Amino acid sequence: MQLEELINQHYSKLNDNDFHILKYILNHKHTCYHLGIDALAKACSVSRSSILRLAQKLGFSGYSEFRVFLKWEDQPEEGESMSFEKLLDDIEANLKFLRTKDMTDMCQLIDAADRIFVYGSGNAQKICARDLQRMFIPRHRYLILIEDTNEFNLMRDDFKVNDLFIIISLSGETPELIPQARMLSAKGIPFISITNLKNNVLAQLTPHNLYATSKPVTLSDRTEIVAFAPFFLVGEALFRAYVDYKEAEKNDNE
């Protein structure tokens, strides 16, 4: 688990002082773990106890354990990776995440939902959404694809608490998407977020998060490319987890 995921997981516990400290840590990831608790407190202009409380809110026993986590997370690669190698790094990071991710709660939501809506916030995300829709057909779960904001707004009064949304967003910060996600949350309609692995608003609005690690690569002409293969991989993993969930349920009933 990376720091951004921990922030999303414990977001409701954090206050402005915590975010001030985290801003410093995120901006000095490669050096802050060299600092003892007093030095970090001084760098952030906060008290020693503020650092300790933040570490405990994030699930660590104390600052020493948090510091080891930060050191472990900072694993620089040897040399400059090329685009293809970075794609492989992204895929390996996603496989590592998926091997340890328990999706039972999401499978239960999929199984119990009267209707399942899938919503991608951009063109590439919509392709991922259509692929997810296609995968679930053999399992007789027919996902309803929402094409855009206008469609969502036309349908919003018909959404029920027994529905389920799967929302795919690269950033998790798309301006037109956040009010819609907040509306779902306010109405008690569950949704699964699939976003890039970083601190983002969409992931903070639901406990049901999946992350696709996809780091941008800047080419020599300053063109930036982002891989969407990790999003397809995460979608496939969700489907396979659901298949296994239903098979296990069938075996238990025999």
UniProtKB/Swiss-Prot annotation:
Name listed for the protein in its UniProt record: HTH-type transcriptional regulator GlvR
Residue ranges annotated for the SIS domain, each copy included: 106-248
Keyword Signal: no
Domain HTH rpiR-type: 1-77
Organism: Bacillus subtilis (strain 168)
Function statement: Positive regulator of the glv operon expression, which consists of GlvA, GlvR and GlvC.
Single Gene Ontology MF annotation: DNA-binding transcription factor activity
Induction: By maltose; repressed by glucose.
SUPFAM superfamilies: Homeodomain-like, SIS domain
Protein keywords: Activator, DNA-binding, Transcription, Transcription regulation
DNA-binding region as annotated in the record: 37-56
Any GO BP: carbohydrate derivative metabolic process
